[in-house]
């Protein structure tokens, strides 16, 4: 696309895209661009999948390029984003049971009429603090976030790139 080399834009999620591509005939796949958030969202699931096992990816354009995240628990067999009569962006998705959801409103969905909290996990890239060859001691970790509802945050640290042969702190 013009001066953009797509391989480097999607390198972080190429394994996920490869899995989707290899199973494309067995999946419901839907996607949309959310203009107001500078995001591209793609959802995929097998026809027999439960809401909990449904997955997706979100790509966000930032000053540092594309950043990617994964989602679980949103079964979107149909997904759309558009502008209403006032020019405000609205986003909706529909599940396999025929329910239609206002995609970015609230803190729960109601698959098949049963309230389900939205679970979220944020994972940073592995950080070497500028020198991968020097051992470091982390004395404290400062977290800043603004939840829009009730939440129960937890913190999980992984050392040496998650190497299972290295003792890791408990979850």
Feature map (PLM): residue ranges:
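Beta-sheet repeat architectures centered on beta-propellers
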Residues: 2-171
């Amino acid at each position: 696309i013009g001066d953009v080399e797509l391989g480097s834009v999607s390198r972080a999620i190429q394994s996920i895209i490869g899995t989707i591509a290899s199973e494309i005939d067995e999946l419901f796949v839907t996607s949309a661009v959310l203009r107001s958030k500078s995001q591209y969202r793609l959802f995929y699931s097998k026809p027999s999948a439960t809401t909990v096992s449904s997955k997706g990816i979100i790509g966000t354009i930032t000053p540092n390029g594309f950043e990617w995240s994964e989602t679980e628990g949103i079964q979107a067999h149909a997904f759309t984003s558009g502008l209403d009569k006032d020019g405000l962006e609205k986003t909706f998705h529909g599940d396999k049971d025929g329910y239609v959801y206002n995609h970015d409103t609230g803190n729960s969905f109601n698959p098949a009429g049963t309230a389900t909290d939205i679970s979220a996990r944020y994972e940073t890239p592995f950080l070497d603090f500028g020198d991968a060859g020097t051992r470091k001691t982390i004395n404290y970790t400062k977290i800043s976030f603004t939840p829009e509802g009730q939440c129960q945050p937890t913190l999980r640290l992984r050392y040496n790139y998650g190497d299972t042969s290295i003792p890791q702190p408990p979850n």
